[in-house]
């Protein structure tokens, strides 16, 4: 392992963790998605383990078939602002959609979070996959996939430009002279594009990190292109080492075409983990959680990926139905993978639904075995880091207490935070102000 390359770790607040029915688990906090004591405990545990960040996902549409913890959960920026006051080094990353918000407001919100946290804010950029989102924002139609990414591209140009409105030392605040700021260090944006007309400047100063860290979630071609141009990190998910390695290579090559270095963007694989004493213990933990998922729950979960399609209309024990292009305008990369996997393995609808709703954790075993898996993917250049989700409701504390020390002993993961900001933790350079380079 290169002395200059360190494994990165984050965790996700995802209800009770485990699968969609894990809130029923004996060890679960049933209202975890709206329980701030649980949220606080998770954040403090992550910081105890020296993790890079805690990530709060989000969505803008629900119905009666939605995943239970999606029905009642905190808005990301609100809960992250609360966590800023009780943590000191942990990065705070939240999702916000470019399809259903305005760049000025987004730039202001994440700049505020970066100031509140002394430089620990991160924005996970999504374009919103669920078509029902349009109904909650006075829209007649959800934008098509390609259009959403064109909007996101310009949106990010605007937000980053607004974050550069003020130079770092623009606010003089000289009481004797009465000069509050230096006008020469204020830069209106005056953006006129295809989708946005934004004058600027932003009404909050340059942030402790220069700019909050930009994450992008998605594995489609459009998503990879957007990340290679704009992002500091990308969230993705692949089932095999070979798929993850191919994705890693592709994104890193696209960075070069954008004049960026491979080290300018970290690739995080989202993984589920079970830590146990031995193989029998791990299997018992998995089966206990998997048994909580009914076939109806599984069909509803699967349908969410396919624009809330009703899969209950098909025979359960016949081959996965031909549903054409359904899913191409929602979770495109995920639905393509589900259909391909079902076809190649000749899976029934029942098998596809249960595998989707209660997948086996990618990395499971003793602490040493889990660490072995993470190390193999990291050193094999299939990932720069991982977003840890517990395969059971009580897995994450075990991961911090038992797996992190193994990674630290192997020199893969740090034993303390290297600085105070999220960029410090991730080893990312502070971006220069684009206006001062002109």
Language model regions located:
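Acidic (Asp/Glu)-rich catalytic clusters
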Residues: 2-4, 47-48, 80-88, 114-120, ...
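An alpha-helical appendage that flanks or caps ligand/catalytic pockets
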Residues: 2-17, 146-209, 242-249, 253-376, ...
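Active-site mouth loops of central-metabolism enzymes
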Residues: 22-37, 95-104, 140-142, 208-221, ...
């Amino acid at each position: 392992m290169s002395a200059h390359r360190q494994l990165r770790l984050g965790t996700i607040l995802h209800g009770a963790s485990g699968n969609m029915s894990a809130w029923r688990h004996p060890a679960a906090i049933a209202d975890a998605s709206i329980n701030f004591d649980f949220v606080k405990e998770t954040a403090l545990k992550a910081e105890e383990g020296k993790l890079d960040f805690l990530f709060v996902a989000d969505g803008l549409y629900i119905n009666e078939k939605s995943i239970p913890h999606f029905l009642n959960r905190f808005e990301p920026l609100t809960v992250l602002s609360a966590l800023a006051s009780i943590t000191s080094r942990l990065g705070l990353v939240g999702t916000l959609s470019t399809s259903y918000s305005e760049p000025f407001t987004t730039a202001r919100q994440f700049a505020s979070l970066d100031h509140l946290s002394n430089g620990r804010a991160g924005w996970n950029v999504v374009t919103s996959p669920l078509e029902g989102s349009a109904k909650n924002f006075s829209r007649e139609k959800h934008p098509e996939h390609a259009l959403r990414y064109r909007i996101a591209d310009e949106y990010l140009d605007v937000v980053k430009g607004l974050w550069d409105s003020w130079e770092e030392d623009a606010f003089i605040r000289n009481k004797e002279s009465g000069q509050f700021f230096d006008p020469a260090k204020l830069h209106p944006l005056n953006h006129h594009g295809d989708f946005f007309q934004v004058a600027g400047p932003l009404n909050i100063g340059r942030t402790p990190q220069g700019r909050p860290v930009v994450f992008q979630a998605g594995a489609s071609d459009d998503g990879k292109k957007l990340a290679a141009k704009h992002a500091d990190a990308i969230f993705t998910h692949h089932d095999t080492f070979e798929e993850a390695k191919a994705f890693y290579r592709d994104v890193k090559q696209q960075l070069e075409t954008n004049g960026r270095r491979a080290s300018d963007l970290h690739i995080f694989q989202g993984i589920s983990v079970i830590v146990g004493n031995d193989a029998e213990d791990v299997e018992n933990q998995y089966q206990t959680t998997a048994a909580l998922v009914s076939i109806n729950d599984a069909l509803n979960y699967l349908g969410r990926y396919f624009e809330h399609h009703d899969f209950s209309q098909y025979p359960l024990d016949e081959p996965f139905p031909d549903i054409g292009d359904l899913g191409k305008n929602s979770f495109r990369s995920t639905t393509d993978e589900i259909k391909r996997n079902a076809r190649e393995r000749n899976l029934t609808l029942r098998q596809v639904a249960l595998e989707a709703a209660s997948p086996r954790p990618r990395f499971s075993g003793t602490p040493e075995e889990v660490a072995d898996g993470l190390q193999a993917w990291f050193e094999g250049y299939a990932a720069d880091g991982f977003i840890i989700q517990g395969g059971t409701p009580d897995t994450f504390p075990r991961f911090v207490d038992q797996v992190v020390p193994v990674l630290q002993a192997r020199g893969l993961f740090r034993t303390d935070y290297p600085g105070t900001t999220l960029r410090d933790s991730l080893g990312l350079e502070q971006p220069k102000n684009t206006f001062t380079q002109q």
